[in-house]
Design a protein with these regions (language model features):
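Ligand/substrate-recognition segments at binding pockets and active sites
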Residues: 245, 407-484, 557
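Gly/Pro-rich hinge or "lid" segments in bacterial periplasmic/extracellular proteins
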Residues: 202-261, 266, 276, 283, ...
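Append "and occasionally in soluble cytosolic enzymes with long acidic Gly/Pro-rich linkers
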Residues: 338-445, 592-595
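Surface-exposed binding/hinge segments that line
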Residues: 154-216
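Extracellular/periplasmic solute-recognition and catalytic clefts
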Residues: 58, 150-160, 241-255, 262, ...
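Aromatic- and charge-enriched surface segment that lines or borders ligand/interaction sites
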Residues: 105-153, 280, 339-341
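N-terminal lobe/hinge region of extracytoplasmic solute-binding protein
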Residues: 54-111, 233
């Protein structure tokens, strides 16, 4: 859809849906329209043909960063390549995101003694044929805890392991709480242990790293090394045979994969621009399409060569407010009480001033819904369904701004700051796709209606990689930003809201936040099955009310699949049932073309 027509539709909807004074718009402002339902597994039952190549498109409007290691990657697109093809995960999860015994290793937890034991099964090998051993299980902890580590996986949770803080500070050469029992067994001691350990939290890492291959690379140089970029040793179903940096990857089947050598010998992964992907799908160029923007669904949904699979994504988009900076020396987030966005009523007003349900209907064709919590609904027992969030209420927004002292002094339609000086908010938003520009203009227009002037930081939309570089670096040109989180199956708040987490991009921290998050990981969660859901609800009630990270939307993750593909399954926990990319077969020599 063209930008002009998107804006026209949106303006028309605003006229049709707006409410007069005194009407209870906020009562309906949280009511979500029904979303579309999708199958999670291909229906193709035809016989496979030998020698066909699986062609995968990754929709991205900028080059692939290309760091393919769980401890080192930062970009979600790299994470997708790892998850599907190059994984080093050794602990499987089920449909409830809880660790099972179906993976490379098993987990046994001793709550009373605050210990966990990881045991590698017999016959497990890396792609180079070397056995997966206890040292490989220990090495990721040594990497992320090292003082020279350049990644972002170290968090408040990591410090729960006995001796990790001393190791991180350089006061110890080993992590005292991690013990190699034998070549296949590792015992980890924790200062405290909570229910999150069963979903890969509490400082537990669910992946290994091939120490025999990586140990000679200084940890400070690991992120730049070809051993995590182009020449990998992995535990997953495929390995890299060749790569064009940023553009494409050629993969070959790993004969040592523990579930069996993949049925399709060769895979190609190509980065494809969002402007050209639907035409390529129609012409039968790709078999699987990852990370396709949801707004393109209306274009390809009727292609007769495509079957669209989908699942509710572990994802929420959000509005973030910059509250301070990350102090690298202290390793924690420092709130600036004088930050432009420091006033709670200002932040809440901006949240109440956005009609997200209206935006979802105009832009996303039933593939998203308004979010009220940082917990997506797919986490059934943890999702706080009664949490109201910020239903659209422009009158309440205006009242909050008045109370906070932001008033229009000169009658130009925009409010000045508390001192009567011109006030504007610099907004960071990502480029990519047809709706990126009209979407941010929608936000700017909505804030204009409550008297707040919003302008684009840098004067334009920001390319994906540069956007996160600026947000992570606390660029002073950014006051607010629109971003999204892929939520880990651990469902731990520490990674994105913790005092010590680099991923806490808002830089918000408070003693109350620390206390409530600690309860989410309390040892009580091990004995009381209702404790964690209740603790999560209490934390969410506080955190959402602070309006530092305002959830905007949940979405479906869509996987357009060419109809020659067989045995592709996207359901969560499908590996517990023995399913996975290694079983995918192709029933035609080339991808099928659409006749429509």
């Amino acid at each position: 859809m063209k930008i002009k027509s998107v804006v026209s539709v949106l303006v028309m909807m605003m006229l049709l849906m707006s409410c007069g004074p005194g009407q209870k718009k906020s009562a309906d402002g949280n009511k979500n329209s029904e979303s579309i339902k999708f199958e999670t597994e291909t229906q193709n039952k035809d016989n496979a043909v030998p020698g066909a190549v699986l062609s995968v498109a990754m929709v991205k409007d900028s080059p692939l960063v290309g760091i393919f290691n769980e401890a080192m990657y930062k970009d979600g697109y790299d994470g997708d390549v790892i998850e599907w093809f190059l994984t080093n995960v050794i602990l499987d999860i089920d449909e409830n995101f809880e660790i099972t015994d179906t993976g490379i290793a098993t987990l046994n937890v001793d709550p009373e003694n605050k210990k966990a034991t990881i045991k590698i099964k017999d016959g497990m090998k890396w792609s180079d044929g070397q056995p997966i051993v206890a040292d490989d299980v220990i090495y990721p902890y040594e990497v992320i805890g090292n003082k020279d580590y350049t990644g972002v996986r170290y968090s408040d949770e990591s410090a729960k392991i006995v001796g990790m803080e001393e190791y991180k500070a350089g006061k110890a050469s080993t992590i005292s709480g991690i013990k190699k029992v034998d070549d296949k067994t590792v015992e980890i001691s924790f200062k405290e242990i909570g229910q999150g350990i069963f979903t890969g939290g509490n400082g537990l890492l669910t992946y290994a790293m091939p120490k025999h291959y990586l140990k000679d690379v200084p940890i400070k140089d690991l992120e730049k090394s070809e051993k995590v970029r182009t020449k990998l040793v992995v535990a997953g179903p495929y390995t890299i045979s060749s790569i064009v940096p940023g553009e494409s990857i050629e993969l070959k089947a790993n004969p040592n994969y523990f579930r069996g050598k993949p049925k399709t010998e060769k895979v190609t992964v190509q980065v494809v621009n969002s402007q050209t992907i639907t035409a390529a799908m129609k012409s039968g160029k790709y078999d699987l399409v990852f990370d396709i923007p949801t707004e393109l669904y209306k274009i390809y949904k009727d292609f007769d060569n495509i079957e669209t699979l989908g699942r509710q994504e572990l994802y929420y988009s959000y509005l973030g407010f910059k509250m301070g900076k990350y102090d690298k020396a202290k390793g924690e987030n420092i709130v600036n009480p004088n930050a432009k966005m420091a006033d709670l009523k200002l932040r809440q007003a901006l949240a109440y001033g956005l009609d997200i349900n209206q935006m979802v209907k105009a832009f996303y064709d039933g593939l998203r819904e308004k979010a009220t919590s940082s917990v997506p609904p797919v986490f059934g027992k943890y999702y706080p369904k009664d949490l109201a969030g910020f239903p659209y209420d422009p009158e309440k927004a205006k009242k909050l701004l008045d109370e906070a002292g932001y008033k229009d002094v000169n009658g130009d339609g925009y409010r000045e700051d508390k001192n009567g000086k011109p006030f504007e908010i610099k907004i960071a938003a990502m480029s990519g796709g047809d709706i990126a520009e009209p979407l941010v203009q929608f936000y700017i227009q909505q804030w204009k209606e409550i008297g707040i002037k919003g302008v684009l930081a840098t004067g334009r939309l920001i390319e994906f990689n540069s956007f996160y570089d600026k947000v992570e670096a606390d660029d002073p040109e950014i006051d607010v930003y629109f971003a999204a989180w892929g939520v880990g199956t651990n469902l731990s708040p520490f990674e994105t809201a913790g005092r010590k987490s680099m991923f806490n991009y808002t830089r918000f921290a408070s003693e109350e936040n620390d206390k409530l998050m600690a309860e989410v990981a309390s040892p009580k969660t091990l004995t009381d099955p209702n404790y964690k859901p209740e603790a999560y609800k209490k934390w969410q009630e506080y955190f959402i009310n602070q309006a530092v990270e305002v959830p905007l939307t949940y979405r479906y993750q869509l996987y357009p699949v060419n109809k020659r593909v067989k045995n592709f399954d996207v359901a969560y926990g499908s590996q517990k049932k023995g399913k996975g990319i290694h079983l995918v077969e192709l029933t035609a020599a080339e991808p099928i073309k659409s006749k429509k």
